[in-house]
Amino acid sequence: MTEPTWTRERLQRLVLREVGDYRIIVVSNRQPYIHELVEGQLQYAFPSGGLTTAIDPLMQECGGTWVAYGGGKGDRYAVDEKNRIMVPPDDPAYTLRLVWLTEQEEQGYYYGFSNAALWPLSHNAFIEPVFEQTDWETYQSVNQEFARQVIDEIDGRPAAVFIQDYHLALLPRMLREADPDVIIGQFWHIPWPNYEIFRICPWQDELLNGLLGNDMLGFHIGDHCDNFMEAASRILGSRVHQEYSLVYHRSEPTLVRPFPISVDFDQIDADARSSEVTDEMGRLTDEMDLGGKLVGLGIDRIDYTKGIPHRIRAIGRFLEFHPEYIGRMVFIQAGVMSRININAYQQLAEQIETLLEEVNGRFGTDNWQPIIYIPTDLPNVTLMALRRLARFCVVSSLHDGMNLVAKEYVASRFDEDGVLILSPFTGAAHELTEALIVNPYAVEQFAEAIYHAAVMPAEERRDRMAAMRAVVQENNIYKWAARSLVDMMQVGRRARRPIRSF
């Protein structure tokens, strides 16, 4: 394969050129390094995920500050009197500043407004949002606390603040009012709903006003940008300049652009080739009795947006239509439970268990069952081995901003084998057009897509996978970080002209 356009080293060179004298401050709910107490000893973990993969090297190069909620049990023991600690632990390069929340604040801000209101509001999964006044008030106060800490960190110096996601929608306006000269950008990692859905939110004006405090606001795809700009126009009366993707609110422009997030292709590709993964493939094949069988895979956080019940039904229909695969195929559904104190997630877990019992009970035998369910947090080497073993991987999201599972599967298949079955309701479907695109609500079509993956000739599998790998390699996580940084810095310096693209 060809060399990728963007690498970690090129991103670091870009940082030096673009940032100049500005202090870079990243703000997110989730922290890049978590400190835990293990048998009285302080240990740290580096959470996996696209956000930390992209921004950690950027921060290591520019030496700024990352402000985040401190949720680790050892975090308070690791920081100094100003709640700061230098990271990474083995080669300190930038400052991590932690924000403390009470249990009540975490409940109202995170589990309440962020994930019981904004999350279902933003995803077309037909889960009714829960809008509680007390949750909204807590969300405001927590955003204000983040603003206070960021302003303290800026301390009157030139600064550029890069905010992450839906937990901090009010923060940009708070920062803009506190320091009009600061450069502010934000990336919204989930979909933005259409106008008719968004306007059910009782605090629609406040959310839009908060986000329009940004110089730059990024989404995964153009449709979400369009939805946001329509909401700003129709709800706030903001002026929208479609050609240049600018929204003018209070005569202040905000650039609204798509920046499709991705993965570290080269790192995943290298990990997939390791002897540890090869050994793990052998262990899993023996342990799960996968030898000679058609293996399918789903890797998801257990969330109602991921369409897990829909794929279980489709597997049942596949076996009904094609009984010759009974005893000859295994579908492995891996994923970790999340947000279990929210009713919708508890109901989802019960629904999944019921459907698994139905399908496995109907088609299973004494020594075989079609679906193996692993609702635990698996180590990376095991996940990588599962990707390598799977003839097909299913991403059946009902609505997803991007979905990196699809790109991780593609990046891991250096053998250029495997079939990706992908929902059209993901951002990834806009890029990975050689996947088998199937509507998860259409159970018969879904079942036939599984059959198509099962019988697809090796040459077609290779052609499709090679094309998708080229897309993911070129549009990797470092390209996302580079485009986001350049556009934020350029528009933040009041360069009111079309921003160049890479």
Residue positions per predicted region:
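Catalytic cores of carbohydrate-active enzymes across secretory and cytosolic contexts
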Residues: 1-502
